């Protein structure tokens, strides 16, 4: 009878120990996912290929993508031949075709292909266009969980907060001072040219 009891206790103990090991490993992986990139770089145990799946090649420098930037407010970003920045709902408009050039990791410059003007933002958060690219033309490109991108000025901030490229529901550019990353006016889909 005792032998019978021991054979049932042994698998139970094995299952419990396996369960505790699984919980421990799960806790460690959760702790690693909450780390900043700097902490992850120093912690070898948490570094894994799965953690870096959102590392896109074009963010590492030198790449050029030709896209239409479609805002969640249903407008395409447009830079016309006079350098005016606004939205258009015409998909086949050549002035809404943009060249997105990677300047540094996560930093891009956006240029209208037809107009040959660069998108820029001044310290007041106003969007404008320039023929020559400078620091006002650099934007931090961030890919959100909802698959939209945001473009924040790499040079200018307002009260410590980032200023984003944004189009309101009428296609008018919103001043960067009035924008936040969570607002749909600042969310853009880079659409491939067909």
From Swiss-Prot:
Key word Transport present: no
Entry-linked SMART domains: FGF
Gene Ontology molecular function: growth factor activity; heparin binding
Glycosylated residue positions: 45
Annotated signal peptide: 1-31
Domain of life: Eukaryota
Keyword entries, A-Z: Glycoprotein, Growth factor, Heparin-binding, Mitogen, Signal
GO biological process: positive regulation of cell division
Summary of the function given for this chain in its UniProt record: Plays an important role in the regulation of embryonic development, cell proliferation and cell differentiation. Required for normal branching morphogenesis. Growth factor active on keratinocytes. Possible major paracrine effector of normal epithelial cell proliferation.
Subunit structure: Interacts with FGFBP1. Interacts with FGFR2. Affinity between fibroblast growth factors (FGFs) and their receptors is increased by heparan sulfate glycosaminoglycans that function as coreceptors.
Family listed: Belongs to the heparin-binding growth factors family.
Name this polypeptide is given: Fibroblast growth factor 7
Species in which this protein is naturally found: Ovis aries (Sheep)
Gene: FGF7
